[in-house]
Regions:
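Long, low-complexity, Lys/Arg-enriched
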Residues: 2-255
């Protein structure tokens, strides 16, 4: 700098100093925030299209509200061994998820039961739903939604941008229930009854359909409340039911 004074006027040096001090201050502030384990879950879409999740992009999504634990995060990568349309495929990836979940999440929880997870999933929908089942509501976790248009895991806003409502349709007497989650697209009842002999249909619909129907944590909370309310209603009205059909058209964060 001393040898090239004309290239570094006082204003530029002061701006460099300010940016450096701001960066140091931001890092120091993170010391006092809660740590979180980044959990990145991937499996080829439709069994053919590989996906990758950037650790840096995930870290940017959680900071500065949380501090990232470790330098690489936790990865659950489920490899495909069978044809996507075969029953062997789902049996294989389900076993793979069980095994990797035990090796990562369960192992961490055994050491630190109160640990917080930030979850970043890119995988076929049934596999993500199984991941949600495995984590349950006892594990402290926040799920993030990938935006393909912005190539980012950051929420688009902090405000609620969508609303969710439920509808019940009784087709005939009986206790065979289907739960239809119409968030990214509206699913017609005939598409359900063509493949599932349902007596009762429960729909949860987004006010605004589309891949961007969940744009914030507030949207996710609103959907979750309506989902819990419908599940409670099914349980209370049909207590003897042990199985229902689930038909999802929804983003990964809601799964």
């Amino acid at each position: 700098i001393d040898d090239f004074e004309d290239d570094y006027p006082e204003e530029s040096l002061l701006e460099m100093k300010r940016k450096h001090e701001d960066a140091i201050a931001a890092q120091c502030d993170l010391i006092y925030t809660e740590p979180t384990e980044l959990l990145m879950v991937t499996s080829p879409i439709k069994g053919r299209y590989p996906v990758k999740i950037s650790f840096k992009s995930c870290a940017n999504a959680v900071m500065p509200q949380k501090r990232v634990s470790g330098s690489n995060g936790q990865r659950i990568q489920i490899e495909v061994e069978d044809d996507y349309h075969s029953t062997h495929y789902w049996e294989s990836v389900s076993r793979g998820l069980e095994r990797r979940f035990f090796q990562t999440v369960t192992a961490i929880l055994e050491e630190s039961p109160n640990v917080h997870f930030s979850v970043f999933p890119l995988a076929p929908m049934p596999l993500i739903m199984k991941l949600g089942y495995k984590m349950g509501d006892k594990v402290r976790a926040e799920v993030f939604q990938y935006s393909r248009s912005r190539d980012s895991w950051n929420w688009n806003t902090h405000e609620q941008t969508n609303h969710f409502s439920a509808e019940k349709q009784i087709l005939r007497e009986g206790r065979r229930v289907a739960l239809v989650l119409s968030l990214t697209a509206d699913i017609a009842p005939t598409r359900i009854t063509e493949v599932y002999n349902a007596d009762i249909l429960y729909f949860i619909r987004a006010e605004h359909f589309g891949v961007d129907c969940i744009q914030s944590q507030a949207d996710l909370v609103a959907f979750w409340r309506e989902y819990q309310r419908v599940c409670d209603e099914i349980k209370n009205i049909y207590p003897q039911i042990r199985e229902i059909g689930v038909f999802p058209a929804m983003p990964v964060s809601a799964a």
